């Protein structure tokens, strides 16, 4: 028979997102050239006829610049592999040559990745192999009635849970307000974070790009708009200068220096969204890395150049802020582990050794 081998790899940048508490005893390395070594070994052991490499990584640009998105790097470099299946960056795309195909179906079940291999076998030996790949759009209207019936009770149970009342909201929350200054949405996250002893300052970013929750009864499903990601909360010791440098780095990711009202304050571009293909204005960088600070009184002068925009007046209680002093800063495990590069690039903090700075952490809030 035909031997089909599937080899899976997780993302080599996991240590840049998650607390070491979640991957203790594991190490991570680039998929290039490691994946080729694994492919060669497994093919020799399994006598594989067709090889599929499935990776939790994005497509990337194929220039070796992103350890988090090495799909195209593997597509260009792997030998003896028929299909590379990737995702993570939510960008639907297919790349093909005569000897290998890359499939990224995107996100939210908008498409299905579809690969075809045609083999010609003579006297038990494969004499030719033809590959093809495509994306099949998922038609929401074309429902499998039998599956719908089989899963109806499960669907209704989940729906009932997500509509369970969990509280009251006194004011409307618009996540988009966070891009232009103080907002009730991010202030809510800051307030929760600062409620965790011994936090004095909070870093937080808008985790939903353009969400809205109306004042009134809050249901469980609304929590996914407020905070869609699973994170732990870390309280990290930082100097005042490191805090300021992180804020400078963060604001430089999402605002421009302007001199008149005719200029764009936000770093946006009028280009098709690579994840959906929709033509719209969007941020140049990811909005979930647009950190602001709670527990501080500060201004952001948008007429000043990068590195000179943030003026910290005091702590929230009016006491002086000192760049040479140390403060306890609440942030997500994603940020503390290096996510968004804010700590590492902004303040030259070695996030591989973040445990040396953690004074408290909360697995659940």
Question: What residue spans do the PLM features occupy?
Answer:
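Catalytic centers of hydrolytic enzymes
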Residues: 17-30, 37, 105-365
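Conserved beta-sheet core of the metallophosphoesterase superfamily
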Residues: 66-121
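Active-site-proximal beta-strand elements of phosphoester/diester hydrolases
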Residues: 2-16, 52-54, 101-105, 130-133, ...
